[in-house]
Swiss-Prot record:
The modification Phosphoserine is found at S24. PANTHER family: GUANINE NUCLEOTIDE-BINDING PROTEIN SUBUNIT BETA 1-RELATED, KELCH REPEAT DOMAIN. One of its GO terms (biological process) is ascospore formation. GO terms for cellular component: cytoplasm; mitochondrion; plasma membrane. Signal peptide: none annotated. This is Guanine nucleotide-binding protein subunit beta 2. It comes from Saccharomyces cerevisiae (strain ATCC 204508 / S288c). The lineage of its organism: Eukaryota, Fungi, Dikarya, Ascomycota, Saccharomycotina. SUPFAM superfamilies: Galactose oxidase, central domain. Keywords: Cytoplasm, Kelch repeat, Mitochondrion, Phosphoprotein, Repeat, Transducer.
Amino acid sequence: MEISSSPWNDGGYSPYERNRVAVSPFSSALEGEERIETSRSLGDHCFEPLPYVTNYLSIFALFGKEIFGDKGNVSSRNEYLLKKYYSLKKPFVLRHNGHALKNPDMPLQRNDILQTNFMVDKFLNRTVRSVNFNNFKIISDMQSKSGRGTKSGTNQNQSADAIQNICLPSIPSALPYFQYYRKLLTVNTKEWDILKLHSLWVPKLRKDFKDFSLYGDKNSLKPIDSHYDEDNTMKKNLFFERSPSRQTLDGKGCASKGYDISSGNMIIPSLFSEDKLPALTYHCSVELNGNIYIFGGLMPCYSYEEDAPMLNDFFVDGIKNLPPPLLPQVINNPSMVNNPHLYVASIPSCRFSKPKMGGYIPPPLLCVQGSKLTDRHIFFYGGFEIRTETRGDENGKYHLKKRLYVNNTGYILDIMSFKFTKIDIIVQPSKYNAYPTMSSRFGHLQISIDNPNRRASVHSSSMNEIHKMGSASMKQGSSITSGRLEKAAVLSSLPHNTVHTVIIFGGYRQTGDDRYEAMNDLWKIEIPVIRRGKKGYCKFSETANAILLTPSEKDKSDWPEERAFSAFSVHGTSLMDRSSLDMRLLNNLKNHFVLKPSYISQDRVVSPKPVFPMMVHGTHQDLFNSGSAAQESPKAGASASSASAASFDPDMDDNLENYIVNPGRKSSSIPMTAIGRQRLILSQEKPVGKTVVLHGGSNGLNVLDDMWLMDLECETWTPIETFAKADSSEDGDEKLDSVNVGLVGHRMESIGRICVCIGGMVQEDVDQFYSENDDEPPRKRKVDTLPLGGNFLNTIDLSTQCWEEHKITLSKKEDDEDRQDSENEDTNSNIVVGVGGTSLQCDKSIILIGGLISRRSNVKEIYLHGTITKSIFPSVNPSA
């Protein structure tokens, strides 16, 4: 039985007809269309498709045409589809029957959007071909017998003999999946789409790349002797192993022989999905409830490197003066198309899906930022859209004109219905600026603030007065005059149960054609909630209020300079406390614990209600002196309390009002030291503060290297000096040198007090990427020299403010190379540079999705990272 579900029916074109490759979708000229006489009048930038360094491969594709049959010339098909894709992007004058559009920002018509999305689906539809289930069953039987170590029988038919004579790969780790998939074949053949959901995608590595290594070793290059074997090198690899004769990973080689669970690792998980994960770059990823929601970005029009189309017929007038880390050779590449879809990845279950979106769907955006509003909603803001106009000439050439349009609209995604809601940002006027404006931006900082006051909690009178003062001053439109920020702007001007707050800082704005300017303005966006429902449903207002937060004149020096594409993460303020442990514990007891008034009054409570009735220690009785405590006189108890108070720090007796739970109730209060074994209750007077760590970024081609802390409670900035451990001196004392690590386009994740900076460019990389001479050879550094921040992983300990060195290298095996002069080689030549990807924390790991990778020895040779990488960092600092 053979079921055919071929997707090649696209208007009569067949990829097997080689003489149809040069056919142009512009063959029938539209009325009023202008032809181009010279082939290089609009652009002369020719591009090449980007290769893959990691990618996902269907497990059925390992057997090639034995299961799927001949796939044909996919490269020619993709070239035709790419020309058809750009033929839909005609100039606006031609799209509307000759009526010129005065507004270039007018969005595309719905019909154009549907046609464009249809063509993108054609690019992604790669593995749905004719499946020969008879051959699949035979191969499955052969894999099963090979896994048990038995030989195939001699009573097979001719088809089985023909397949057996072919050298098929033996994958023991895939045997359970083959057995599982055979059971799925018992379903009704009319429901073929069900089987697509159970397709398994396994990671694939590039041939000339061997392994990843979490920590680089300067002594990794050593002479070969008789005692040197492959096992010695594999003990240092903490990621995965691959057989030298194969391109795919085997289940037995996922961990090296010398693997230590406390040293951390990095793996590429396989995925169950109907669709292949595209190699996205400059996209947005948000983690919510254990799932990762991926939106926007660019993706290649080919799923595999061998399917890449020829780009000789495309000439691009691209976007100029792009700031780092936006690479012109990627943004302007005609093989990189906009991603119009939303993807959902579940890391614990290794599931990947492409849901159908609804509502006010935003355009394909690059460098858009997303943040969590509620457990059900995600807020997207900023980014930019790339719009392309296409013209054809008499020679069948395609001249593309790409332009950048910055987005200034917010969108809220409901993850249960996958519907988008459009939010317009309205700036609140003040007495200093009656008509303020908020510039459209990309590459900005965006953080959602979880306001704990939305829940019922105990507030002190001072906090209530601050709320009243803040609301009154906001109504008067007063500006920021006291402190570094205006106190009224710290608190929300709307009720806490009807508003969600988002903080936005910096980014690039567009000041003209191909001109961009960095900013350092700080905004607070308040998104009102009109109605709430079951299961976390919220109906948001169509408009959101934006409040500008500016520093005072005397504190402008304590404010970060203009920047964009900086890294940031959120930490608790307690991480920056330098006091000793005992003092922190005492201060915590003093500030957050009070005595319940009923238990320190003159009349003892006869039968108190237990906190935990099922536990012995849950009662309020003195279990240590139960017999004598009941007969103890109040006077003795009072004297004991006073004696205990006198024996401790007398400074704690000064502020007695801090221990009063309810000012309206008559009750006595005593210092914290006199509590003894009485019951303590936690005071919810003050919410836990949060601190935003901001590092690096760029202002044009200048890479910044400073680090700042922002207190979200007070909304104040504080510069932080960073250090690096220097070589030990002769007396054995360790020295610290004050250093600044400059990075742009990197990501930051927090693990306790450790900040992990992932990827990014240093100033040296920016100088090479954005040099005017593209043919300039890469600069050669001195041996064993690496710029600060040149590693793929850079970590800093916030408690010591010290940078630590970690590396991810791509090691290339060279069997026939003499290593006698290895000391003269650059040991850092295989360290990688990564930009354009996203990182987030999910499933107790750091997840890396997509992006671009290149070797530091040749940064202009860019590769696509088309997989999801899961990183588990060491539980113990190896340098400690």
